[in-house]
Amino acid sequence: RQAFNRVCTELFAAPERMGVAALMMMDLDNLKHINDTYGHDWGDQYIRRTGQCLRDNTPAGTVCARLSGDEFLVLFHGYRSRDAVREKIDCLTNAMQQSVALLPSGNALHISLSGGIAWYPDDGQDWETLKKYADFAMYQVKHADKGRVEEFDIGVYNREAYAERTRREFRQLLSNAQVFYCFQPIFSARSGRVVAYEALMRSDLPTLRSPATIMKLAREQGALYEIERITFTKALETFDSLCRAGS
């Protein structure tokens, strides 16, 4: 892993050597099942078979490494176009799908990988950014339909990042009761007098300016009771303080 990082850092420092490049991060789909069912020796054999397939089906100069237990990284570099890289990636993934590892039962298990691809220089021009984006693309595959390789999509990334920030700020809102209340007077049509007030919940957290967003997250996360509790206590406290101030 350290050697892979060192080589990639050196390559990224020399754009003329990188050309059009793709960083592909891959995760073995069945490793945990093999380890749990047959033992780690057979899981190690599955890993070795994957490594052999990478070595035998990538062009000379391609940088390959095992990142962790079930994750592999491949850097295709020095190409003139994305299509040229895609041809090499297709050859590799097809070879992977045809490769098998023998199990103690005598059955042959096809290697299954989920992968994500980030492009240099379009998606990022440094090693850490490409690795982050390739990792994101890979986990999009793993959480949807395993056994595929997908390219990074900045639009999906931005939507997911915003959604995660919204969830994080909602947790912050619940923990700190980070809302305030405005009061809308309700008038009697007959007398024209104020007969009640409607408490309107607001938040100054950037992604939670809309009460509709807060309520949607509360329903999704089973936190409606918490919102009701916060509203009951804070709305009454705010109303009382406004009355005392003569508002």
Which residue ranges define each predicted feature?
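Helix C-cap/alpha-to-beta connector motif
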Residues: I230-S247
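PAS-family sensory domains
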Residues: R6, S114-G116, Y139, C182, ...
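Catalytic-core segments of nucleotide cyclases and related cyclic-nucleotide turnover enzymes
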Residues: H40, R86, D90, S105, ...
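Catalytic strand-loop-helix junctions within cyclic-nucleotide turnover domains
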Residues: L75-V85, L103-A108, L113-L130, G155-Y157, ...
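Short beta-strand edge/capping elements of PAS-family sensory modules
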Residues: V20, E128, G147, V195-E198, ...
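C-di-GMP signaling machinery
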Residues: Q2, P121, F136, Q140-C182, ...
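Conserved long alpha-helical elements within nucleotide-processing catalytic cores of c-di-GMP signaling
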Residues: R1-A22, D29-P59, A65-G69, L73-V74, ...
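Catalytic core regions of nucleotide second-messenger enzymes
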Residues: A65-L67, M96-L113, K142, C243-S247
